[in-house]
Amino acid sequence: MFLGLSVHNLDEKGRITLPNKDRGAFTDSIVFATIGFDGNIELYPQDAYMKMAEQYEQLSDFDANNRQLKRIFFSQSNQIEIDSHGRIQLSKPLLNKAGISKSVTFVGRMTHIELWDTDKFNELEKKGEDDYSCLAQNALKQVPQNK
């Protein structure tokens, strides 16, 4: 389970150190990285990534939008080995798409981690905090209530 925030910097070789508290969730020293829906990078343990990949594969290839979605998702995905110092090397195209050049904010999202350019995340967080009450009210209306 991934929770909380932390900020790390890319080193001179473009590597980033995973937060200590999260390293154990990545079995076999493997992490899967892909582009997120909001201009960020998402990191998944192998089991969570495989579940998501299976959902994508269930989409019919007879639909052009499904093919394009699968094409983007799988072409932007990378299997990355975690080195002995807990670092990963993200691809330059993935870093460029997310606008990450130095400071990286790690955001725990329960099943995965989002990576954001820190300045971009700070702007997003400020807006989200301002709208938190409205966001929660609208989202929680969709959740069935236990009685």
Show the residue positions of the predicted features.
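Flexible "stalk/tail and boundary" regions
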Residues: 1-8, 12-13, 22-80, 84, ...
